[in-house]
């Protein structure tokens, strides 16, 4: 069905204020909820937070009073939208439960976007980040058992594999190396622009969640694990935002933000299986259609251009959630040794081709001098169970040692690194579900 967001009818802006009872709705059931309902809720929380952040920055840098007032009015509505979406999570869902949900978003969303990204360089960047978030899911899954005695599939529902990725201790870089070549706003498709904003919003929300909640556990190793992975999420935000053309005007950015909200809410509405939450996506889609129209009016007034030049006439689907096991496994086996080269080309290389003075070596050696928390995670689970918790096809599990041998940098290993030999010596754990 054709859906031109600028031509659709939404909720009039003067009808968008809601009561507190409507803003704070009943949360979903932690036990019964579909895992991808949870991922949609997590992502849309990030989408709304990015919209709120952007409009505050816009308001601080704009001297057009009419525009600043309208931005402030829309921002108030979007703040309440964020409240609604965030409050859909139940109080009985622990921080680690939610963390597994965040990493499921990161893995399955990034894989979806990579497969639906027309720009080869942007797709390569998505795949690069994918293998890092995949390893984060593996590390946090150990803590779900160590801290709360939980099976990670209570949250993941067997839709996303749990197995080693590119080792987290090797994710720490000179942040300048993370900067990527930006797209040309005059040549790049709306699909690429929306894809980047969608993933950027999710990664930014992940960083913020870990920064604001990781300290709330008492176990020092777990607290440090949150700190370590939070640092990587900062690098991911840096990496993805650098893909955006810095010459975009603030009005162009505003239109793109509103269009991204329309697309993501539309996608959530089309896919949602929970009827009560589907109503939330439908209502907020109708609100965002009007926000987009307002942004388009200001864009056309000030820049004398039609907003369709930016966003086209078709809706996009940037956040369809489904199992991505086969795609992720293929990227894992072929790209686990990939690294950012640190050259003016802002490209990629492999571990064996890194120069001795690669800037990220010093960063990794410094932060890992006393050990890497994410390596201690595996030491702790092995001390408890004799090996790590994994959930994947047995053939893939049997490749863990080989994957580590390919993906672990020999030059910057923390003193507590779990070695390839350690993985080779781990007993079979294909029946780990029997623990629960």
Please report, for each region that a protein language model flagged, where it lies by residue.
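Non-heme di-metal
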Residues: 1-436
